[in-house]
């Protein structure tokens, strides 16, 4: 294989590489064997057409595309490795020449990892808003949240107020015509929860069981269902029940209901204070780490960050998010309808965070390289065991999912973060 690289612009260039006849022949054989079972030829059983007959009848060139798909990934990776390039996005592949009996020549437009010029990243002085202190109010607020969680809904005779739950039937229409998804029976709606479009819940405040209420609203311009976006709608709503929350008394019995390991309200307060102090300390340490890393990134200069890196990170984040939604039984279409957002909105939502994450990773990688951090065999083994414990899976399964290079990279990154944070101080 011969390879060359022509620089076209900062972090951009073209790789030209060849594929040998030996590798081409193997790829052509694989391509032929893949389709052989479906081939017919006079005098031969189906799937037994000899290669020379195929070449004479169809021409070997018809196999070139499949053969290229077979041989290209390995050839491209070998070219990148030989040239010592750090490619960060999918290449644009073009065929330069594919002549019978000769080496194939291809080109790949690539984007390479940008240069990072490090600034100060040790002994940084940072400011954080977080505090390790836990007040009595913090403890009381945690108990109050648990108290509210134990509240029961009871039937209310009077008018519905904010925070009450109404059980309703509703039928929606636009210009007198009902629309899909605009109808519901015995639906429990907490007033003030924001479950329905703006203005709907407010118009049910003051209603009583048995009332029929005409609710008039306008769908937001950004509503997912384009045929409803910006349109005025009317919902004929029947109130079946009004329910209000009944919260338990703040006493020792409540404390035991919240946590069976305590006997009194005072015991619960002591326990919650310890839990909150531990959580606050973790949050404080995380805030210091985040501020120190952010300052280290700000002190560095990334030379012409390729936009492709941001796009790939956005796509990765969006795909991960939508995958989580689908595992919960929510399709992309359902998600966008429920939230009144679009695919573009979701991409925009992740763009700023993607930009920050890419820059942070580049700077931390540069620090790891500057410090000469590497992972030892024992550190790799410890990382595997830690991941196995964290995700409750066998260590061998972790080994099969993560390559040694990935583990070495992650360990080096952790060491770089430790250098930043362990030397930082708070102003």
UniProtKB/Swiss-Prot annotation:
The record's EC number reads 5.2.1.8
The UniProt entry's GO biological process terms, in alphabetical order, are: 'de novo' cotranslational protein folding; cell division; chaperone-mediated protein folding; protein transport; protein unfolding
**Limits of the PPIase FKBP-type domain:** 163-248
A family per Pfam: Trigger_N
Could you list the residue ranges forming a coiled coil in this record?
A: none
Q: Which domain of life is it from?
A: Bacteria
Annotated domain remarks: Consists of 3 domains; the N-terminus binds the ribosome, the middle domain has PPIase activity, while the C-terminus has intrinsic chaperone activity on its own.
Tell me, in a sentence or two, what this protein's role is.
Involved in protein export. Acts as a chaperone by maintaining the newly synthesized protein in an open conformation. Functions as a peptidyl-prolyl cis-trans isomerase.
Protein name, please? Answer: Trigger factor
The organism named in the record is Streptococcus pyogenes serotype M18 (strain MGAS8232)
Gene name of this polypeptide:
tig
């Amino acid at each position: 294989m011969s390879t060359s690289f022509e620089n076209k612009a900062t972090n951009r260039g073209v790789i030209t590489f060849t594929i040998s006849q030996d590798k081409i022949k193997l790829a052509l054989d694989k391509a032929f064997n893949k389709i052989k079972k479906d081939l017919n030829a006079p005098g031969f059983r189906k799937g037994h057409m000899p290669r020379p007959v195929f070449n004479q009848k169809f021409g070997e060139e018809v196999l070139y595309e499949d053969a290229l798909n077979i041989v290209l990934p390995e050839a491209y990776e070998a070219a990148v490795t030989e040239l010592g390039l750090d490619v960060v996005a999918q290449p644009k592949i073009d065929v330069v020449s594919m002549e019978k009996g000769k080496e194939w020549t291809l080109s790949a437009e690539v984007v390479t990892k940008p240069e990072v010029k490090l600034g100060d990243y040790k002994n940084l002085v940072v400011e954080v808003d977080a505090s390790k202190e836990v007040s009595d109010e913090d403890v009381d607020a945690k108990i109050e949240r648990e108290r509210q969680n134990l509240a029961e809904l009871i039937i209310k005779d009077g008018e519905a107020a904010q925070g009450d739950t109404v059980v309703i039937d509703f039928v929606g229409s636009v210009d007198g015509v009902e629309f899909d998804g605009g109808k519901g029976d015995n639906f429990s709606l907490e007033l003030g929860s924001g479950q329905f479009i703006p203005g709907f819940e407010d118009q049910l405040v003051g209603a009583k069981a048995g009332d029929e209420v005409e609710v008039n609203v306008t769908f937001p311009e950004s509503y997912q269902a384009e045929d409803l976006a910006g349109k005025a709608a009317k919902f004929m709503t029947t109130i079946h029940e009004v329910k209000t929350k009944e919260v338990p008394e703040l006493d020792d019995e409540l404390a035991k209901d919240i946590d069976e390991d305590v006997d009194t309200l005072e015991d619960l307060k002591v326990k919650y204070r310890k839990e909150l102090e531990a959580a606050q300390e973790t949050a404080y340490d995380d805030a210091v780490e985040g501020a120190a890393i952010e300052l280290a990134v700000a002190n560095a200069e990334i030379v012409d960050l390729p936009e492709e890196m941001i796009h790939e990170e956005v796509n990765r984040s969006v795909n991960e998010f939508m995958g989580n939604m689908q595992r919960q039984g929510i399709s992309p279409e359902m998600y966008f309808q429920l939230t009144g957002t679009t695919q573009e909105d979701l991409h925009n939502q992740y763009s700023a965070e993607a930009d920050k994450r890419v820059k942070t990773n580049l700077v931390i990688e540069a620090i790891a390289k500057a410090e000469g951090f590497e992972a030892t065999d024992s550190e790799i083994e410890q990382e595997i065991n830690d991941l196995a414990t964290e995700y409750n899976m066998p260590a061998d399964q972790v080994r099969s999912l993560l390559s040694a290079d990935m583990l070495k990279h992650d360990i080096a990154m952790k060491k770089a973060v430790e250098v930043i944070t362990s030397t930082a101080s708070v102003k």
